[in-house]
Amino acid sequence: MTMSQDNDNYWNLLNQRTGRSWNRFWFAPSDPLPLCFLRLAVGLLSLTYLFSFNRDLVRLFAADGLMSTETMEAIRGEAAIQGWIYFSVLDWATTPGILWIVHVVSALILILFTLGVFTRTTSVLSLLVVLSYIHRQPVLTGPFEPILSMLLLYLCLGPCGAYLSVDRWRATTQGVAKVGGEGAACWTATVSLRLIQLHCVGFYLLMGLSKLA
């Protein structure tokens, strides 16, 4: 075997092993139970975040509150091309009464998500709820909100209602749960967990680098 053939074999083997490692890291089926524990924790944190506005809800989020809708439109107007990014259901609350209705409905959505009721749907709705509060009053945001919204986003991708949820209980009592069903290991659980892990590493890296500035 010539040196050229040895080099070719080395690079082919390296390529194959790298590809297998990459696929195993991202797509190897895994148990969704860790995601379900995360759903409970993130759901409770989201509810705590939402309930923290109860006392000053109207003053903070009303159409004529501290940050009126006109002020927010002016701020968003500076990025008109990306205006859709700042979507908020709270913009529809033109009166204090409607604002409280939106607030209560938002809390109910987060409660359903935490309990694992129609999790695939309520996970997406919960993300929209939290983003609505962030976009409506951006001056109140801190380091907590980006992490919370990141976790909600990635929980939408995986089967976070496979365990510890009303969905699981309903499936079991109705005889739907079986091998290969909601509770089985799947690649989407792996993707969701890996994205969370890498995003958290990115946060820690940026915080560490900021200390050097």
Annotated model-derived regions:
Residues T2-A213:
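Alpha-helical membrane-anchoring segments
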